[in-house]
Every structure is written in C-alpha cells, then in structure tokens.
Regions:
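A short glycine-rich beta-alpha junction/loop motif
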Residues: 1, 153-161, 187-220
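Non-catalytic DNA-recognition/assembly elements of restriction-modification systems
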Residues: 1-33, 38-72, 212, 216-262
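Short, solvent-exposed loop/turn positions at domain surfaces
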Residues: 4, 112-113, 194
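Short coil/turn segments at secondary-structure boundaries
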Residues: 38-42, 73-80, 102-103, 189-191
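Sequence-specific dsDNA recognition surfaces
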Residues: 61-77, 91-127, 131-132, 146
C-alpha cells in the first residue's frame, strides 16, 4: 500500500499533465482556428479563408529566428571530441513533452560545434528521421530551464533531429501550430526516403506550408496563458521523477527488512 501511494501520485501527475496539455491545445484551437475571441471584429479574405483583420498568412520561417543541426559525436573522449554533452534523440521527445527529464545518452563533440549547437530555453527539437508507416516524423518537444539545469546546460540534439529557435514572442504559438499540424498528419506529405528510414523535409515545411500568423500582442497573450500550463507540466514531471527515484530506492530496503514503513514519514513525501 505504501509503494502504491508513489505509483498513484505519479499516475495522478501524468493525468494532470495530459489534461493541461489538452487545455492548451483547446485554447489554441479556440483562438487560432475558430477565432472565438475575435468574432466581433472585422474579418478579411485570405488564401486560408476568412481571418481577423490585422492578421496575415505566412510560413513558419516568418516566426523562426534560426534552425540548428544536431551532432552525435563520439561515445568517449577522442581527439578533439572533448566537450561532454547530452543528446536528445527522437525516442526522448515523448518523455520530455510529459515533463519527464528522461535519460539522454552522454556523448563527446568538438567544443566549437557545441558553441553553435547548444540548446537554450524555449528552443524546439524536431525529429526529422525515423517514424513508421503509421507515425510521421516531426515529433517535437520544447526545451525548458529545468531540463537545462538537470543536464548542466550541455544539451544538443542528435543528427536525426533538428532544433528550431522561434522568435521569442511566437514560441508558444509556433509550438502548438506545429503540434496541430502533426496531429492532422500534415508531416506525412513532407516525408521522403526509400531505405526504410523516413526523412522529414523540414526546410520545405518551414518555407512552404502556409500558416495564419496573429499580431505580436495576441501571440504574447497566448504565450502568457499557456506558459502557466507549461510550467505546471514541468513541475509535475520533476515531482514524478523524484518520487520514482525515491520509490526505487526505498522498495529494496523495505523488502529486505532493512527499513520499516514506520521509519518513513509519508507526510513529508506526499505533502
């Protein structure tokens, strides 16, 4: 029963995070697909249909500062590969999205490459190679301060991923627009590859796929609201990770009799 308290709390955090993410996606749809808060204003024609006056149709490149390629480096220090880094793989993306810091592999890259490839708070990492017949490439996650702190601000993505640095004011808008496109299957139409590994034509997607772009002040207001959801998801993820580690530490000691349940103050753990 004591161990199940850990599992129950971890599961509760997972469900809360799932709900928070759904709320953020619903808010995005309300604002930028259905235009609910703006229906009393004037609308104009565009190539994507009627949009609020003052908005425009553009592409992802209009709200992206730059993109970064990945680096896989070496398994151990070798020659000029001396900079220790942690690499985000496509397989790590689902965990990072849930707020789980995961276990990224350690690699060693050339120091000057790290200066240009190091990930920062607010960056997005996109999986550009992989996928399956039913799962598109293009899965994405955001880089948080908590993730950077855990890995000593030494994170890059692998060369099977690509990092995007959004314009700061559009970072949340870009992320949820990307998520909506991914869930709609749009990334399938930008894939190529005949060797069994699919590759995402990320440059084509960024430069060609038309999107609606709201004014900066609206993008900032959306960011302000969804940042609350995002920070709570990250906080819950950190808590669940700590609970998981503590559970795995206590369980063998409890089973061996080294520690009794009465020795553990569950009030301090589950407060």
């Amino acid at each position: 029963n004591f161990i199940s308290m850990f599992n129950d709390k971890i599961e509760l955090n997972r469900r809360i995070n799932e709900n928070l993410e759904q709320q953020a996606q619903a808010l995005f749809k309300s604002w930028f697909v259905d235009f609910e808060p703006f229906k009393d204003g004037k609308f104009v024609d565009s190539e994507l249909g009627r949009i609020p006056e003052g908005w425009k149709v553009g592409t992802f490149k209009d709200i992206i500062h730059s993109t970064l390629s990945g680096d896989w480096g070496k398994e151990c220090k070798q020659g000029n590969h001396t900079q220790k880094v942690f690499c985000i793989r496509g397989a790590d993306i689902p965990n990072i999205k849930r707020g789980d810091k995961g276990n990224m592999p350690t690699r060693f890259i050339i120091e000057k490459n790290f200066q240009s490839k190091a990930l920062m708070d607010g960056d997005m990492v996109i999986e550009v190679s992989g996928g399956s017949p039913t799962q598109a490439t293009g899965r994405a996650c955001r880089i948080s301060r908590g993730l950077l702190d855990k890995y000593n601000h030494s994170i890059v993505c692998t060369n099977f991923c690509r990092a995007i640095k959004p314009l700061s004011q559009y970072s949340s808008f870009l992320y949820y627009m990307w998520e909506m496109f991914y869930n709609q299957g749009i990334m399938f139409s930008y894939e190529n590859g005949t060797t069994g590994i699919k590759n995402l034509d990320i440059n084509g997607l960024i430069q060609k796929e038309p999107i609606i772009i709201p004014p900066v002040e609206i993008a900032l207001e959306f960011k302000k609201i969804t940042q609350i959801y995002y920070e709570k998801i990250q906080s819950n993820g950190v808590e669940s990770e700590k609970l998981s580690q503590l559970r795995d530490t206590l369980l063998p000691r409890l089973m061996s009799g080294e520690l009794a349940i009465t020795d553990v103050d569950d009030r301090s753990i589950f407060q």
